């Protein structure tokens, strides 16, 4: 009896349960990357494995609206809503970047009910490294 031919691109060959397994995570790390154009919020466990993430672009904001504080607040709320359902109570916050969404994202994180152990600014600062881009002339 001949074996059935498996299609390589079929979904039957993939593992289905490993994608959305619900782990109980009591403590995590919330990374906020706020640039002038977008804000990305990533929630990881203490070992650095990504649990949930969201950005202003995935929340439906396009163009210059992605860099606004309201877009950052919405992105932070979406990322945290998923991990609160998984049982996260405590978190550390690491904020990176000069964008407008820094404070708005932190405000949304505080309002979510997660206890914050500390808030750390991890923006990379050069010790006179590369030459910055030239000034804009509008």
From Swiss-Prot:
InterPro entries: Ribosomal_uS11, Ribosomal_uS11_bac-type, Ribosomal_uS11_CS, Ribosomal_uS11_sf. GO terms for biological process: translation. One of its GO terms (molecular function) is rRNA binding. It holds the Pfam family Ribosomal_S11. GO terms for cellular component: chloroplast; ribonucleoprotein complex; ribosome. Residues 1-23 are annotated as: Disordered. PROSITE patterns: RIBOSOMAL_S11. It is found in: Plastid, Chloroplast. It comes from the Eukaryota. Residues 9-23 have a biased composition (Basic residues). Keywords: Chloroplast, Plastid, Ribonucleoprotein, Ribosomal protein, RNA-binding, rRNA-binding. Part of the 30S ribosomal subunit. Belongs to the universal ribosomal protein uS11 family. This is Small ribosomal subunit protein uS11c. It comes from Nasturtium officinale.
């Amino acid at each position: 009896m001949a074996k059935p031919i498996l299609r390589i691109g079929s979904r039957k060959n993939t593992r289905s349960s490993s994608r959305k397994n619900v782990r109980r995570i009591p403590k995590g790390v919330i990374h906020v990357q706020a640039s002038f154009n977008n804000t990305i919020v990533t929630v990881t466990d203490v070992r650095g494995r990504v649990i949930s993430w969201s950005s202003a672009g995935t929340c439906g904001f396009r163009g210059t609206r992605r860099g606004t504080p309201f877009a950052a607040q919405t992105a932070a709320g979406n990322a945290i809503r998923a991990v609160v359902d998984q049982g996260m109570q405590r978190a550390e916050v690491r904020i990176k970047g000069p964008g407008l969404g820094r404070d708005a994202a932190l405000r949304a994180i505080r309002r979510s009910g997660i206890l914050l152990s500390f808030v750390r600014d991890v923006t990379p600062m050069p010790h006179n490294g590369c030459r910055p881009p030239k000034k804009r002339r509008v």
